[in-house]
Amino acid sequence: DCNTLKRFKVKHQWQQVFSGEHHRTEFSLHFWKEFLHDHPDLVSLFKRVQGENIYSPEFQAHGIRVLAGLDSVIGVLDEDDTFTVQLAHLKAQHTERGTKPEYFDLFGTQLFDILGDKLGTHFDQAAWRDCYAVIAAGIKP
Protein backbone atom coordinates (compact mmCIF):
# COMPACT_ATOMS: atom_id res chain seq x y z
CA ASP A 1 0.00 0.00 0.00
CA CYS A 2 1.54 3.28 -1.16
CA ASN A 3 -0.07 5.34 1.59
CA THR A 4 0.39 9.04 2.35
CA LEU A 5 3.45 8.54 4.57
CA LYS A 6 5.16 6.28 2.03
CA ARG A 7 4.44 8.74 -0.76
CA PHE A 8 6.01 11.52 1.30
CA LYS A 9 9.10 9.40 2.02
CA VAL A 10 9.52 8.44 -1.63
CA LYS A 11 9.21 12.06 -2.77
CA HIS A 12 11.64 13.24 -0.10
CA GLN A 13 14.22 10.52 -0.77
CA TRP A 14 13.98 11.01 -4.53
CA GLN A 15 14.58 14.73 -4.04
CA GLN A 16 17.74 13.89 -2.09
CA VAL A 17 19.25 11.87 -4.94
CA PHE A 18 17.75 13.46 -8.05
CA SER A 19 17.71 17.23 -7.59
CA GLY A 20 19.95 19.64 -9.43
CA GLU A 21 21.66 19.05 -12.75
CA HIS A 22 24.79 17.50 -11.23
CA HIS A 23 22.85 15.00 -9.12
CA ARG A 24 20.64 14.05 -12.06
CA THR A 25 23.58 13.45 -14.37
CA GLU A 26 25.54 11.53 -11.75
CA PHE A 27 22.53 9.41 -10.72
CA SER A 28 21.65 8.66 -14.34
CA LEU A 29 25.18 7.59 -15.23
CA HIS A 30 25.42 5.37 -12.15
CA PHE A 31 22.00 3.84 -12.80
CA TRP A 32 22.52 3.05 -16.48
CA LYS A 33 26.08 1.83 -16.02
CA GLU A 34 24.86 -0.73 -13.48
CA PHE A 35 21.65 -1.55 -15.36
CA LEU A 36 23.36 -2.32 -18.66
CA HIS A 37 26.21 -4.14 -16.90
CA ASP A 38 23.66 -6.40 -15.20
CA HIS A 39 21.55 -6.77 -18.37
CA PRO A 40 23.91 -6.68 -21.38
CA ASP A 41 21.22 -8.39 -23.45
CA LEU A 42 19.20 -5.16 -23.27
CA VAL A 43 21.88 -2.86 -24.73
CA SER A 44 20.40 -3.45 -28.19
CA LEU A 45 17.15 -1.79 -27.06
CA PHE A 46 19.10 1.46 -26.86
CA LYS A 47 20.75 1.26 -30.28
CA ARG A 48 19.00 4.44 -31.47
CA VAL A 49 20.61 6.38 -28.60
CA GLN A 50 24.03 4.70 -28.71
CA GLY A 51 23.40 2.33 -25.79
CA GLU A 52 26.76 0.66 -26.36
CA ASN A 53 28.36 3.91 -25.15
CA ILE A 54 26.61 5.28 -22.07
CA TYR A 55 28.99 8.25 -22.11
CA SER A 56 27.76 9.45 -25.52
CA PRO A 57 25.69 12.65 -25.54
CA GLU A 58 22.80 10.73 -27.14
CA PHE A 59 22.67 8.12 -24.40
CA GLN A 60 23.27 10.65 -21.62
CA ALA A 61 20.27 12.66 -22.86
CA HIS A 62 18.13 9.53 -23.15
CA GLY A 63 19.10 8.31 -19.69
CA ILE A 64 18.14 11.64 -18.16
CA ARG A 65 14.83 11.64 -20.11
CA VAL A 66 13.86 8.23 -18.75
CA LEU A 67 14.63 9.22 -15.17
CA ALA A 68 12.92 12.59 -15.69
CA GLY A 69 9.79 10.61 -16.57
CA LEU A 70 10.07 8.82 -13.24
CA ASP A 71 10.72 12.17 -11.58
CA SER A 72 7.53 13.60 -13.08
CA VAL A 73 5.49 10.72 -11.67
CA ILE A 74 7.10 10.85 -8.24
CA GLY A 75 6.51 14.60 -8.16
CA VAL A 76 2.75 14.08 -8.38
CA LEU A 77 2.46 10.95 -6.21
CA ASP A 78 0.18 12.84 -3.84
CA GLU A 79 -1.99 14.42 -6.57
CA ASP A 80 -4.27 11.56 -7.59
CA ASP A 81 -5.76 13.02 -10.77
CA THR A 82 -2.46 14.33 -12.13
CA PHE A 83 -0.71 11.10 -11.11
CA THR A 84 -3.26 9.05 -13.08
CA VAL A 85 -2.89 11.26 -16.16
CA GLN A 86 0.92 11.09 -16.01
CA LEU A 87 0.87 7.28 -15.69
CA ALA A 88 -1.49 7.02 -18.68
CA HIS A 89 0.81 9.24 -20.74
CA LEU A 90 3.88 7.14 -19.92
CA LYS A 91 1.95 3.92 -20.50
CA ALA A 92 0.99 5.10 -24.00
CA GLN A 93 4.63 5.94 -24.78
CA HIS A 94 5.90 2.57 -23.58
CA THR A 95 3.12 0.66 -25.34
CA GLU A 96 3.93 2.47 -28.60
CA ARG A 97 7.61 1.54 -28.24
CA GLY A 98 6.83 -2.11 -27.49
CA THR A 99 8.42 -2.05 -24.04
CA LYS A 100 8.00 -5.40 -22.33
CA PRO A 101 6.34 -5.36 -18.89
CA GLU A 102 9.20 -7.32 -17.31
CA TYR A 103 11.61 -4.46 -18.08
CA PHE A 104 9.87 -2.43 -15.39
CA ASP A 105 10.69 -5.11 -12.83
CA LEU A 106 14.36 -5.05 -13.86
CA PHE A 107 14.31 -1.25 -13.75
CA GLY A 108 12.80 -1.29 -10.25
CA THR A 109 15.35 -3.75 -8.91
CA GLN A 110 18.19 -1.60 -10.23
CA LEU A 111 16.56 1.56 -8.93
CA PHE A 112 16.35 0.13 -5.40
CA ASP A 113 20.01 -0.94 -5.54
CA ILE A 114 21.15 2.53 -6.56
CA LEU A 115 18.88 4.25 -4.05
CA GLY A 116 20.28 2.00 -1.33
CA ASP A 117 23.81 2.93 -2.40
CA LYS A 118 23.01 6.64 -2.34
CA LEU A 119 20.80 6.82 0.76
CA GLY A 120 22.36 4.12 2.91
CA THR A 121 20.45 3.41 6.11
CA HIS A 122 17.97 6.20 5.28
CA PHE A 123 16.60 4.23 2.30
CA ASP A 124 13.01 3.18 3.02
CA GLN A 125 12.85 0.12 0.81
CA ALA A 126 9.31 -0.79 1.89
CA ALA A 127 7.98 2.63 0.88
CA TRP A 128 9.77 2.47 -2.45
CA ARG A 129 8.68 -1.11 -3.11
CA ASP A 130 5.03 -0.28 -2.50
CA CYS A 131 4.98 3.01 -4.39
CA TYR A 132 7.08 1.77 -7.29
CA ALA A 133 4.67 -1.18 -7.63
CA VAL A 134 1.84 1.31 -8.17
CA ILE A 135 3.92 3.35 -10.62
CA ALA A 136 5.09 0.32 -12.62
CA ALA A 137 1.59 -1.19 -12.74
CA GLY A 138 0.29 2.09 -14.15
CA ILE A 139 2.94 2.29 -16.88
CA LYS A 140 3.39 -1.34 -17.91
CA PRO A 141 1.94 -2.00 -21.36
From Swiss-Prot:
GO terms for cellular component: extracellular region; hemoglobin complex. Heme b binds at residue 94. Coiled coil: none annotated. Disulfide bonds join 2-131. PROSITE patterns: GLOBIN. CDD domains: Mb-like. GO terms for molecular function: heme binding; iron ion binding; oxygen binding; oxygen carrier activity. Keywords: Disulfide bond, Heme, Iron, Metal-binding, Oxygen transport, Secreted, Transport. Its main location: secreted. It is found in: Secreted. Residues 1-141 form the Globin domain. Pfam families: Globin (PF00042). The keyword Disulfide bond applies. PANTHER family: GLOBIN-LIKE PROTEIN. The giant hemoglobins of worms are formed of a monomeric subunit and a disulfide-bonded trimer. This subunit is monomeric. Belongs to the globin family. This is Extracellular globin-1.
